[in-house]
Amino acid sequence: MKRICLILSILFSISWYVGAQNIPVPLNYERLYDFLDELITDGAITAQTAVRPYSRQQVAQMLKQAQMMDTTLDNRQKKDLAFYLNEFALERDTMVNAYVQYTDHQTYNLSLADPQFSYKSGNNSFKMRLRPILGADVTINKKGALLQRWWGAELQMDIANHLSIWGSLRDNSWSGNWLSEKYFHTDIERIHGARIHYGASQAHPALSNMPGVQYKEANYGGDFSDSKGGISLYTWWGSIGIQRENIRWGDSYHASNILSGRNPAVPMITLQLTPCRWFQLDYFHAWLVSNVLDSTYFYLENTTKEGALAKNYRPYNKFMAANMFTFTPIRQLSFSLGNSIIYAENTIQAAYLIPIAFYKSLDHLLTKGIASQNQNSQAFASISIRPINHLHLYGSFYLDEFKLSRLKKSNPEHNPISYLVGLNWSGWPVRGLSLKAEFMRSYIACYTHSIDVLTYASNSYNMGHYMGDNAQSIYTELAYRPMRGMLLKLSYTNDVKYNSYAYLRVYRGPDGVIRDGGIGETIAEKPFDHAIYRNDALRLDGMYEVHPNMYLTLSLEYNNAQGFDNQKTDALPSEDLGDAQHYLDTFCPLYYHGKNFTTSIAFSFGF
C-alpha cells in the first residue's frame, strides 16, 4: 500500500500545472449544460457528451476554448460566455466580479447580490468558495397547491491545484397543507398527495423524470435532505476520488437509458483517465441502497425495563462496478463502450475494483464453481455523430442479455435490451433556436432480475430510463434563447408503459407446487403489445438566470395520465394484472392523475 501511495505521489508531483478544480458541476445546473451543448452542436467547442457531470476543471477548459473561437459566436452567446467565465473565475486563477461586493480584487470577494464568499491565496495554492442555498416553488392545479422549499449551503475547496474537497447540504420539504379536500379527504391522503416522487399507492417511485428522493417522516407531506460531497486527487490527465454525486452515462437530452442519474446519489469510488485527446476511461465502484431486508442481520432493541428485545432488520449490502471507454477518433465522431455488474455480498469483491475488466467473465469465475446463481451484469454503448455544424445525431444501447439466436424469426424470444436514438438541430437558420427529438424503447425484463437485491435499481429507483421495462418514450423539444441567461422551452412527452412482468425463474402455483417460472416464455411475449399506462404532457418552461446559480422559473403544463385494464384470463404467472386504477395508482402520483393544467413558479439560488 505504501508503494502504491508513493507511485501516485510521484506521478502527480511531476504532472503539468493545473489551475482548476476537479469538483463536479451538478446535473441540475440546466442553463450551463444547455449553453455548453449549444456550443458543442454549433461547432464552437469540442467535448464528449456521453459521461456527465463535467468537473469545474473541464467546464473552465471548454469556456476558454469558446473564448478562443469568439468570432463564431453571436452577441448573446458572447454575453453568456462572459457570464460563465466570471462564474468560473477561481478555476481561471482570478476573482469573481460581482455587482455588490466587498473585495480586495486579489484574494477575497464577498458578493451580496449573488450571495457567496470566494477566497484564493496569493500563489493560488488554496481556493475556496462558500455559497448559501435557498429556494421555493409553488405548484398549482385543480387538486390544490403544493409548496416546496429548500435551504442549505455548499463549500468547495482546492488545495495545491491537485486536491479538491467539496460538500453540500440541501433540506427539502413538500407541503400538502393547501391540497383540495375534494381530492384529498384525509390528512394521510394530503401527505401522500404531496409526495409526488411516488405513485399514488406509495409502493414504488412514479414513472417520471423527476430526480429521486428518499422521504423521511413528516406529518405535512414529503420531507427529505440531500448531502453530497467528495474528495478528489487530480491532475491534467486524470483523477481519483470518493464522492456522493449523481452521474449520467449515455448521450441524451431528456433521460438516458444507461445511467440516467435519476436515482438518489450514492457514494462511490471514482476514476477518470484522459491521457490523450481521443480517449477517456471512466470507472466507479458504488455502494447502492438495496431496500431489501436481510433476515439474518438485525439490531436488538430494548423495548421494556425488563429487557424485552425487538429485532430491527437491516438491508442487504448492494454494490455496483462499472466502466466506460470513450473514443473520439475524429472531431465529428465519438463512441463509448462499457459494462457493469450489480452484486450483493457481505463485503466488497476485490475483482470488481479492477477498472479495466469484463465483469460478467469475473462473475462466472466467482460463482459457477458452486453452481450458484450469477450476479447481475450489463453491457452498454453510446454513439455521438456530428456530421455538420448545428446537427447532433446520437444513440445509446443497454443490454442485459443478448443472444444471436433470438434474432432469428423462428425464435419467439426477444433480447432484453433498451435502445435510444435522438437528434438535436441547433443554431441554424435562427441563432439561439434548437429542435430536439428523442425516442426510447425498453424490452421486457431488461432492467429486472429474479433476485430482488440484484435489480438495476438503488433506493427502488430504476437507474436506467425512468419508464423501466417494456416501455416507450417519445420526447420533442423546441427551445429558444432570446437573451443572456434566458431559456424558453416548449416540449411534448409521450410515455407509454406496456404489459408489466416480474422476472420469475420459479413460482408457487395455487396447488402449492413449485414450477418453472418460464422466463423464456416471458421474453417470448409480444413487447409493446397492450398499454397499461400512458401519460402525455405538453409543457412550456421559462427560465432566467439572474446571477450565476440564481434562477427565476415559470412552468405551464398540461398532462393527461391514464391507466388501462389488463385482466386477461390466459396471462403468464409472471404478468401483473389489474384494472385501470391499479396501474394509474402504481405509476402516477395522485396529484397528476387524469387531465391537469399545472402552473409552477420558482425562485432559487445555489440550486
Regions found by a protein language model. Give the residues of each.
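Bacterial Sec-dependent N-terminal signal peptides
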Residues: M1-I23, F607
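Short regulatory "switch" loops immediately downstream of catalytic or recognition motifs
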Residues: I10, M69, L288-Y297, D495-K497, ...
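Intrinsically disordered, low-complexity coil segments
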Residues: I10, W16-Y17, H204-A206, S295-N312, ...
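Short N-terminal segments immediately surrounding and downstream of signal-peptide cleavage
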Residues: N22-D42
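Outer-membrane beta-barrel channel domains
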Residues: I23, I45-A50, S55-Q57, Q67-S334, ...
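Extracytoplasmic/secreted proteins, especially bacterial periplasmic and envelope-associated proteins
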Residues: R31-D34, E38, Q58-Q65, F83
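Generic structural marker for isolated residues within well-ordered, non-membrane alpha-helices
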Residues: L36, K228, Y475
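Exposed, low-structure sequence patches enriched in small/polar residues
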Residues: F224, T328-F607
